[in-house]
Amino acid sequence: MPAHTMAVMGGTQEQLDLYALVRRTHEECVAAIHPGVEGNDIFKLSKKIIGDAGYGDYYNHGLGHGVGIDIHELPNFNRSKNIIEVGSVITMEPGVYLPGVGGVRLEDYGVVTENGYEPFTKTPHDLHVIDC
């Protein structure tokens, strides 16, 4: 199920900045997905973006994975050297979680084509702020 983020009570500036970082990470990683690329290279890109922003210690899971009969299949977007192939159904799901502050995760499902990543999920990545 795709994951999207909402801020309740307006969100602090740190939470809003964190959301912008995760969204940028998602967008840059999606743009880097092409047939023949190693999943590990996309993962390294995500680690660099988040690490350069000072949040590397709070990004402790994989970036995404293949989906098939099982929800977690190859290729993996982590430290593995799985090759991304045309027709692979994958998730892209960067997330950063800060104790005492909150967490942000954006997750989409899609397929790898000759031209890159084509998302199945069409939910906008706009941040929804709910004032209570």
Task: Label each region the model flagged.
Residues M1-C132:
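Active-site neighborhoods and metal-handling regions in enzymes and metal-associated proteins
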